[in-house]
Amino acid sequence: MTPAARVKPEDFFTPDEWLLLSSRSSFKGLALLLHCWVLIGLAIATGVVWPITIPLMVMVVGTRQLGLFVLMHDAAHGLLHPNRRINDRAALWFGGSELHIYRPYHLQHHRFVQQSADPDLVLSAPFPISPASLRRKIVRDLTGQTFIKQRFGPLADKMRVPKSNESVWVLIALEVKAQRAFLITNSIGFALFTAAGLWWAWLLMWLLPMATWLPLVSRLRNIAEHALIVENSTDPLRHARTTHTNFFERALIAPYWVNYHGEHHMFTQIPCWNLPKAHWLLASKGITARIEVQGSYAAVLQRVTTEAVL
């Protein structure tokens, strides 16, 4: 299959502009990782001191869990730190233990974006959908059904139709091995919180956000990035969507400039913190008129559901 069309940075930016946009920082990426974990810690502490705030803290922590994924995504492109070893280790230790699995998967997504070989195409292909279908998806996310399906669905499928030479215990052992990083890190977290007498805080303000708010904001991110984007497009400016955000959307849905997805697909060498600058420069040159841009996440959801009922 032919790879997706690409743009040349020099067609859009001066050499000085491109140097500014594509420069990697020894400080900023690591500072963002620290920022993310500090916000998570402050949110959990707030919920412990003022339990009435726990519903809001679930949203804050879930969004920052997505933030860790966003920063791990930058690391998959080698953008978190100019030193590749530091880049990878920082992502593995503090951004997500599945970098080695995610990187080849994600780079294939970029290589064949919105084509049949794109592993993420299944996420955007079903759209448009009806408003009722979207509501059902949101309910599944917020009730933990999506989390359970993603974490335990593959094992359940294998146990339902096992191979003749595989026992249930073998299947369970293989699944535990596949998810050992997730199980180990969360077991350590639970043990530490339990030792501090705060086991309930781990359940309510780490596991619950992971099982509810994180699946929802991850779904909204996927919808905003590629839903209703034309498949097999030869225009590299139309491979993804950028969505403008307000303060509340950045705080509770789209952390660390993940909303500038059109620019990211055009220029994968730009770290996330420079994507707003890239957008501004492109806008000043009239280029954003050629990019799929929506004014808010609500506008995206309205579009992907309205077209289904026309």
Residue ranges and their predicted role:
Residues 91, 136, 140, 209, ...:
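Generic alpha-helical structural context detector
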Residues 1-62, 71, 94-204, 272-310:
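Non-catalytic, topology-defining segments of multipass membrane proteins
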Residues 162-225, 229, 234-235, 243-260:
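C-terminal membrane-associated helical module and adjoining short loops/tails
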Residues 60-72, 100-102, 145-151, 206-234:
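Transmembrane alpha-helical segments that form the membrane-embedded catalytic/substrate-channel core
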Residues 68-77, 102-114, 221-228, 255-270:
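Histidine-centered catalytic micro-motifs
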Residues 21, 80-97, 118-133, 233-248:
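Juxtamembrane helix-capping/reentrant segments at transmembrane boundaries
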Residues 28, 59, 65-66, 178, ...:
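Alpha-helical hydrophobic/aromatic positions enriched in membrane-embedded helices and signal peptides
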